[in-house]
Amino acid sequence: MVEKQFNIDLELNDTGHIDPFLQDEDKLKLEELIPRILFERKSFLNVTEDSLRKEIDNSLKISEEDALDTEESREDTVEADQQEVFNKHKFELSKNINNALNETQLSLDFVSLLISSVKPSLAKSTISPHLSKFVKPTSLNSDRLGQDSNDNQESKATDSFGQGWKLESLGKITDLFREASTNLNDQVIKERRYWNMINLVLANDEVLFRMRDPQNNARAIGVKYGYGDSGSNFHDQGLALLRKDNQTGEISFHPISSINNAKIVEKVSRFIRVKILSQIDGDYMLTGQSIFNFDFEKSKQSIINDIEKARFFLFEEDLFHQLIREAKLLVNYNVSIISNKIIIEINNIIIEIESIVYDELNEEELENYYQNVNEYSTLHNKKCQLILNYLKLMLCCYYKYNLKLKQKVPTALTKWKQSNSHPLILRPLVGNMRHELNLLNMKSVLDRLMHAHESELSYSKLDVEKFINLATRSKKQNPFQKSIEKPISKFHLVLCNKTSNMLDVNIQLTTNESFVNLIINMTIIRFETEDDFKNNVNGINVLQLGFSDFNEIEECLDWSIQNFV
């Protein structure tokens, strides 16, 4: 047992209150305090400083010991209280565990005794030894109670509810199957329509390829409607996406920029129109114009018409692009480029080749209704249409030329030709027209000289042979030979003076590869007699010169004739 110390406050009475009759020494007066001190100390004769110091130290030690004793007693009291609480809780826990074990054992024994009549072996393994000793294993049994009529009604209602739920589920499943069948049938119809349209495009001899739809990256089929496989090197390859409509299964035509970086592009359809303006009464008036003539409704299928329409306008765009390339080389020969128009000026005639935006709603523009103003406005319509057809044919020839270069064995020469070749489309047209004009000018020069020296000559004869380079060809010549070879024409002038001397003048008009430059080669041979001229013997070569201007050759020929006569 821990020893407990009890301290009694002397100032407290038996009820725990301070006694009012006890005097507080701190509040006593001096005359009351001195007698009490004398009574306690009795005598001050033997009081010294050391004795007082010892007394004070002893009093301090006593107070410290009292404080320590008080703290120890408090700690012991707290520990005793905690131990008591722990023991109490431990006892309650043990009691609860025992109660739980007893109740569990009783429940187990009850269940074991209940099933002992059905499963004896299982009951023996689980029943407690005490119960098996005092109670017979099969003494406890159970019976099933009979059901009331309400239970039968409830079971019937339950069966009815079950059948209703089954019927409802069956109806929902039937609707789902019917909806799935309808959707599947619609999908089959859409797929059949889609592949039928793809087959129509393929049957139209179109080239198809696989690609991704740039809108949703889904698999799709594209079509090549351009002329890349025919020899075209135009930057627009003519590619389009055949996009499927998920609602109907039909396909629609959408041009794209390229295969690798496919983007849907909105193209502006343009076509080429040729106009001729002639000088009438000092003013240039429209005397001819080509007609836009293309049937976009040849097929019953809109997708085929869209492809043909895109192919037509792509060809027109490529043609005008090649014409612009050539026109830049002919700027010094009265050929100018203004916006989307090429202007050619030749001998009081202006030929305009213009790229016009196609507007299917503007029928007056397409059919030239406004052109029939006077008798001259349609004078050269056929000529304009022939010029346009010629330009298109020459572009096809250029395609064929490029295709042959691609089929040849790749060498440095063929690669150079592929990258540096320019089409012969506009230059042959302008060159041959200028050549015809040069022939007229040359003939007028010779006629003027013959007329000027007519009195001094006894005989003169002029023969003109046009395009002698084509005349030497066989009958199976290339119909485009005139457009791919530079023109060569010949003037043969024979003069005879009063003394029967003969002067044979041969003039050849040609050009270079540009088809527009003027090259004149003149050869003059003098014969003493007419027989020498006929036999082509004893001829004296007087002149053999080349010219590029009619004034120069006129002066030179005039001087030669004056010396001859």
UniProtKB/Swiss-Prot annotation:
Q: Where is the composition biased (Polar residues)?
A: 138-152
Q: Which InterPro entries match?
A: Mediator_Med17
Which Gene3D superfamilies does the annotation name? 6.10.250.2620
What is the top-level taxon of the source organism?
Answer: Eukaryota
- From the Swiss-Prot or TrEMBL record, what is one GO molecular function term? transcription coregulator activity
Q: Give UniProt keywords alphabetically.
A: Activator, Nucleus, Transcription, Transcription regulation
* Predominant location: nucleus
Q: Name one GO biological process term.
A: regulation of transcription by RNA polymerase II
Name of the molecule in the record = Mediator of RNA polymerase II transcription subunit 17
The organism is: Candida albicans (strain SC5314 / ATCC MYA-2876)
